[in-house]
Amino acid sequence: MTLSSADQARLDQFWEHCLKNQYFNIGYPENADFNYAQLHRFLRFSINNCGDWAEPGNYLLNSFDFEKDVMAYFAELFSIPLEESWGYVTNGGTEGNMFGCYLARELFPTGTLYYSKDTHYSVAKIVKLLRIDCRAVESLPNGEIDYDDLMAKIAADQEQHPIIFVNVGTTMRGAIDNIATIQQRLEEVGIPREDYYLHADAALSGMILPFVDNPQPFNFADGVDSICVSGHKMIGSPIPCGIVVAKRENVERISVDVDYIRANDKTISGSRNGHTPMMMWAALRSHSPAQWRRRVRHSLNSAQYAVDRLQAAGIDAWRHDNSITVVFPCPSSRIARKYCLATSGDTAHLITTPHHQDKSMIDALIDEVIAEHQPNEWRAGLGLAGLDGVPPERVAASHFDVI
């Protein structure tokens, strides 16, 4: 590959930008703490996982063996036997959500999909693309679905086969819809378990709840029919990706035999990235369950540290149990822009993913939020200046490298 000097300079400039901002992210669920150096050599190959990783295909350069290991890992993590499940490495959380909703629609073609107003924006696209009837359900103040409103809407619709989109960690507030409560309420109104579908969007929390002592219900043992998790959020990846797992009996309904690839196609996309399954495989193989627990505990401790600091300054900050999403009142647009914070209405959040291995970035943000909240007292007490500077840059510790 030959580039002009101007094009090369443009790449070099972007390289410096990436180096400077590698660990900037505190407002979005993305973990920059990874090192896939041992996989760099495979970038010279066009690796394509078209089709089903469980069957031999006609395209030789695939990473099916690695993808199978990844799916075996997540089947166990989400409490379903591998032989009773099927899933794949997706392009991200939206594809995983679409896959789950697609299975639900094929199982209940006339069913209505119910989702809370705190649900990820991808659901609005999905229901349009799949042409599923849908109903938005009110949210409780803490971000969970309003269970009374859910049941009222199901009753008003006289829906016999509801499709419930369950949030296992909402985007803005990290709320987890109570799967046990939903099932209990449906049972109370006489809807049998086999007559409805539960899809769980666990984009961030899917790699948190399996590694805490007292997780909220979220997996197949707790009653879900499908679940998806992102690969670039808690695990970390240079390429956005995700994992979706579903019950095999439901997946078989959408399987199509494609003669020219000599494989059954069960996925949303045709050609699929063959590099991301290898990255997920490397990340999972290089961290023991104890190491994942330590990573999760570190992130949870950092989140609680942020809550404590903000509350000590009189700022109404909070988080859910087992959540690394810290919710607080929306600061000025200057602070939100500087720290790339996600805001919605009068609410903002910070997210303590594993690349925050010390508290420098968290402290820098909180210092400014406190200064804005109580400027005179805070500045007098700490004598701070230069708050308009760039947040401190950091280097990730090597003991968290994936490879």
Curated annotation (Swiss-Prot):
PTM annotation (N6-(pyridoxal phosphate)lysine): residues: K233
GO molecular function, one term: histidine decarboxylase activity
Pfam families registered for this protein in UniProt: Pyridoxal_deC (PF00282)
Coiled coil, from the record: none
SUPFAM superfamilies named in the record: PLP-dependent transferases
Transmembrane segments: none
Gene Ontology annotations of biological process type: carboxylic acid metabolic process
Swiss-Prot/TrEMBL cofactor(s): pyridoxal 5'-phosphate
Residues given in the record as substrate binding sites: H120
UniProt keyword annotations, A-Z: Decarboxylase, Lyase, Pyridoxal phosphate
Reactions listed under catalytic activity: L-histidine + H(+) = histamine + CO2
EC numbers: 4.1.1.22
Quaternary structure note: Homotetramer.
Family (UniProt): Belongs to the group II decarboxylase family.
Protein name: Histidine decarboxylase
Source organism per UniProt: Pseudomonas entomophila (strain L48)
Gene: hdc
